[in-house]
A protein has these predicted regions:
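Hydrophobic anchor residue at the start of the ABC signature
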Residues: 45
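H-loop/switch region of ABC-family ATPase nucleotide-binding domains
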Residues: 90-93
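A short, proline-enriched helix->beta-strand linker immediately N-terminal to the Walker B motif
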Residues: 50-54
């Protein structure tokens, strides 16, 4: 059974979220729809982290995002992974981003696993060619 954790209305926003994504502190009183695509993605990740999950699922976090924000998101993912208190499942088509962050990888095609291994093996196993369009 999977559910979504919630925080009571009016709860304090964890300070750590602003440390992870400083731009959100500047945008605190703006509506989410008024934020850029990259800021919205950072907000979505921060909201997912607010409840202190044991598993963080990130589905294409780099989709349509400018390079500087991709670097920020990568920095946050590395920091969170380094803490070791949550598992992170990254679904990503941007090969370089995935290769840089992966401890382990799995490549699927039409619902079937066609390759898997350690992140450090991605290059030697020719994974870039498997995910090229």
């Amino acid at each position: 059974r999977m559910g979504l954790a919630t925080r009571p209305a009016g709860s304090e926003i964890p300070v750590e979220l602003f440390e992870l994504f400083p731009v959100l502190k500047q945008m605190l009183y703006r509506r989410g729809g008024d934020l850029s695509g990259g800021q919205q993605q950072q907000l979505a990740i921060a909201r997912a982290l607010a409840s202190g999950p044991q598993l963080l699922v990130l589905d294409e976090p780099t989709e349509g995002i400018q390079p500087s924000i991709i670097k920020d998101i990568g920095r946050v993912i590395r920091m969170l992974a380094g803490r070791g208190d949550m598992a992170i499942l990254l679904c990503e088509q941007y090969y370089d981003f995935a290769e840089e962050l992966a401890d382990d990888f799995l490549v699927m095609e039409r619902g079937e696993v066609i390759a898997s291994g350690l992140g450090s093996e991605m290059q030697s196993k020719g994974i870039r060619q498997l995910v090229s369009i």
